Amino acid sequence: MPKRNSLLDGTRTSPQWRKARPKLCVLPVGAFEQHSSHLPLATDDIQVDYFGQFVARELGAALLPTLNYGTSLEHTGFRGTISLRPETLMQVIRDIAGEVERQGFRTMILLNGHGGNFSLLPVVRDINRQDRRLKILLVSWYTSVLESGAQGKSDIHAGEVETSVMLALRPDLVRPERPRLKPSVKGFQQPDLTTFGMGFIAPDGVYGDSSLASREKGEKLIRRVKQDLMKHIRERLEWLRRSRIYGRSGRAEK
């Protein structure tokens, strides 16, 4: 296995991967979609790629290239947004899972960076319940942000949290304007995005208040995410060590 201060990724050669023979790999999954007028289209990709590198280094895992497209159908109508259909994303995951399993990997951490990638749930469940040699652990890097309450119910997209994280990671890509949500209707809820799309409720493409963002907040959020993310992953890797059979406890059946 490579040392923690190195990274087994796409910059390495095939013989280097063969020599390392890792059993654990990380696949970051992002999205290529609008983030209003102040954040780049690749925001989700940049963020999940950063955390993917961090996780791979911490665990001595192989890092697969970030999947830069996700399901972003709720952003239909915004120029630059490129979305996969849910069934396409599911098939891509199936194909990648088959390839890494064939090469000897036994666990793949699927690190999600886009809240709209709901189709990852059923495909991961379907693969895991087959009790194949490969197990997939699905994790979203922003889960701890949601659980901590740092991201309010009105801060869903391109708002305070995402802008703060980008100010910490890539301030050179954050434009000076700070748009905020100007809802076109009252009583709109996040599930309504599946019916009306982002452009209906938020023509400017922001669901939140980016004016509240700061680099300091972003750095604080990143530190918290790193800590919570590794605790979450290590705990579940231990669960997998105890039992890799889907739906069965770690205790032997009598």
Regions found by a protein language model. Name each.
Residues M1-T107, G113-K254:
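Extended, histidine- and acidic-residue-enriched regions that form the cofactor-binding/catalytic faces
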